[in-house]
């Protein structure tokens, strides 16, 4: 039923000219104070995994629909742990043990990558166990690509590359935030006004950045 529902969503969205959607939400939500619970599928790992997997297969037309131009790309979000922010507060820190991440939090995303072939993954707001998610190379490259073999693109959440500088204070400048996000594995910056917009000038001073930019462009194309 979920697959059929999202198949209709994918077809109708494509008819309206869309090519991708920032859905489904693969987070586990376990705090009733969290204001975005209605976007997720619940607190259970198995249920969320099945719902997310079938939602992606449906909206993408089991991936074949993208090539036929009948469906749109999915973006599973928010990688990782966003549904369990401290106090249920948006942008709050996330503290989850490694065992819980592997056994409970990661499986919906792993299924999205390996079984449903999601076109996109969105990084999480805030930080995970003290490391800013949008600068977390071990997570966005080590787990997602090296362990799971993900070949799609990673998109930032809204303005979160810029927030590495002006909100989280882990980058010394907007330019440094842009480089941090790019090196971590963020291919698309949503939005780029205060971060990736600096890349054309940055690459003139540091030609090595061109390799990272080319890598991200290939993933998107």
Each PLM stretch: what is its role?
Residues 1-221:
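Glycoside hydrolase catalytic-domain context in secreted enzymes
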């Amino acid at each position: 039923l979920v697959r059929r529902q999202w198949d209709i969503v994918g077809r109708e969205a494509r008819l309206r000219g869309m090519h991708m959607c920032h859905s489904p939400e693969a987070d586990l939500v376990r705090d009733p104070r969290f204001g975005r619970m209605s976007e997720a599928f619940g607190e259970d790992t198995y249920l969320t995994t099945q719902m997310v997997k079938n939602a992606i297969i449906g909206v993408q037309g089991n991936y074949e629909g993208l090539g036929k131009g009948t469906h749109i790309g999915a973006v599973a979000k928010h990688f990782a742990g966003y549904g369990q922010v401290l106090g249920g507060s948006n942008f709050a820190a996330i503290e989850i043990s490694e065992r819980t991440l592997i056994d409970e939090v990661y499986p919906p995303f792993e299924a999205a990558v390996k079984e449903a072939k999601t076109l996109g993954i969105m990084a999480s707001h805030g930080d995970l166990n003290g490391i800013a998610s949008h600068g977390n190379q071990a997570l966005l490259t080590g787990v997602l690509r090296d362990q799971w073999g993900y070949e799609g693109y990673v998109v930032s959440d809204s303005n979160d590359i810029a927030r590495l500088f002006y909100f989280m204070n882990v980058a010394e400048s907007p330019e440094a935030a842009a480089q941090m996000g790019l090196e971590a594995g963020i291919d698309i910056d949503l939005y780029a006004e205060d971060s990736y917009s600096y890349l054309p000038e940055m690459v003139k001073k540091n030609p090595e950045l061109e390799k990272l930019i080319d890598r991200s462009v290939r993933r998107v194309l």
